[in-house]
């Protein structure tokens, strides 16, 4: 579910890198880990792609067919529906069994994580209204806020922060949401949101001893935004 499996500067992320053998099966990988591929982000490919258009043009019948296949596994269906922005399905499943709201997949992602990284605000709102845990962490220690900030889903990140998400939560690699936003070249809005929050601690370091500003200075054209916190007590490298 984590859409990120490497840094944007081409350096593998130490807590998310995958070690593939020479003969790994790509189709099998897509089948088992397809949820790790971003569904709400823009591609850098500028050409025309009939295949991409076909992907975007799946009709209601296709979605209902997929739901029917998963109907006997409501937890799996809820995770899928949250990622695919199927609000009616999410509501139906939670009305039948509200405890599924915090169900998890094999990587410990919850429906809220999936909706957050996909940028589906309506789903996020519904899940939180039904008791979704904004502090839930994956096997790598990612919260839903990490997922939203990594993929520049600013409105989702803002809503999560309004509902007690920890802006300074750190993953197993000691990455904060600000670290992840700083490593995204398209994250201007999310960086502004985080840096203008009175509780943000931009001086926190990851396990490579880097602050978010260090990452932004290396990878982002928006490193100047860190001037927002320059001179603030929170901007000193302290936890």
From Swiss-Prot:
Transmembrane segments: none annotated. It is found in: Nucleus. This is Ankyrin repeat domain-containing protein 49. It holds the Pfam family Ank. The modification Phosphoserine is found at residue 49. Coiled coil: none annotated. Widely expressed in fetus, at a high level in fetal liver, brain and lung. Keywords: ANK repeat, Differentiation, Nucleus, Phosphoprotein, Repeat, Spermatogenesis. The keyword RNA-binding does not apply. ANK repeats lie at residues 73-103, 107-136, 140-169, 173-206. SUPFAM superfamilies: Ankyrin repeat (SSF48403). One of its GO terms (biological process) is cell differentiation. Induces HBG1 expression. May have a role in spermatogenesis where it promotes autophagy in response to serum starvation, via the NF-kappaB pathway. It comes from Homo sapiens. GO terms for cellular component: nucleus. PANTHER family: ANKYRIN REPEAT AND PROTEIN KINASE DOMAIN-CONTAINING PROTEIN, ANKYRIN REPEAT-CONTAINING PROTEIN-RELATED. Its main location: nucleus.
